[in-house]
Amino acid sequence: MPADTVPSMRVLLAAAALATTLLLPDLATAYSWPIKPFGSPHAIRGSFGDPRFHLDAEGALSAFHFGVDIAARDGTAVYAVEPGVVVRRHADSVTVGRPSGRRYGYWHIRPVVRSGTHVRLHQLLGHVLPGWGHVHLAESFRGSYRNPLRKGALTPYSDHTLPTVEWIRVLTPLGAPVDPSVVTGPIDIEASIYDTPPIAPPAPWNLARFAPAQVWWSLTGSDGVVVASSLAVNFQFGLPSNGLYNWIYAAGSYQNKPHRPGEYLYWVVHGLDTTGMPNGSYTLEVGAVDTRNNLGTSSVNLTIANAAAG
C-alpha cells in the first residue's frame, strides 16, 4: 500500500466524522453497561449495523441491526444505564426515555417495571429471557438510532483490533466477474469486510464478527494521484435508512450465528464508469475502520483498457 494513501484515507474518515458530529450534537453523553459489573467492558456478539434477515408473513425482510447484543447468561439482571421514565413496556422489552429526547431500549428481558415508572440510574429493569443469552441495547435520539459503541457512549469500551478486508471483487453492473487486468466501462466493487470483537463472546458465539464502522475506497493512478474516492458505508454514529440495505449489503450477507461467524459483503462501489479515465494501471484500495479508528486495508491492481473512441 503506498504510504501517501493512508493520510488521504484518514482525512476522509475524519472529515466524515466531523460532519456527522456537527449534525448530531447529542453524541457526547456517556453511560455505563446495563449488566454488572457496570464499570467493566463486556463481550458483544452482535454489532450495530450488521445484516439482519428474517422471514415473516409478508416475506423476506432485511434491516440493519439497530443496537448491540451484549452477551449475558439467561436470567442475568439488566439495569438502567440512565435515569428516566419507562415510556414503553412489552413482554420482552423496556424503553426508558429522557427529557432530552434520548431513549434506551432493553430487549429480550422479562421486565420488572411498569410503563410510566420513574427509574433511577442502575435500577433493576428485568432479567434476560430464557434462550436468548444476551440483552440487546439500543440507543436513539428523537427517533434516530445511535451507535452505542461510538466514542463517548457505552463506557468503558476499548478496541485495538484491526478490521479485515478479506477480499475485493470487480464486477460488471449485472454481476459478472471482471478480469482486473482488463477493465472497461462501468464496474461495481464488492468486498468482504469484518472487524474482530475486542472481547470474544462465550461459545457458541465465540466466532462472532462485527460490522465495520466505516468503509472507504480510492482509485489511484500509477503516478500516485487519487482519481476517485468515497465513503461507502458509515455506521460510526447512526444508521442509514433500511431502504438502502441492498445498496450497502450484497447478497449472501448474514449476521453471526452459533458456531458460525457472520458474512459481511459490501457494495463498495456502484457503477464506477472508467470510460472517461486514461487507460493504464491503477490501484483500487478498500479500507475499513472501527469506532476507535483502527484501520484495515487491502488493494487490487486494475488495468483500464477501454477501446479508443472512433
Predicted regions and their residues:
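Well-ordered beta-strand positions in beta-sheet-rich domains
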Residues: A77, R103-G105, H118, T297-N301
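A short macromolecule-binding patch
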Residues: R102-R110, N147
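Bacterial N-terminal signal peptides that target proteins for export
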Residues: P2-L13
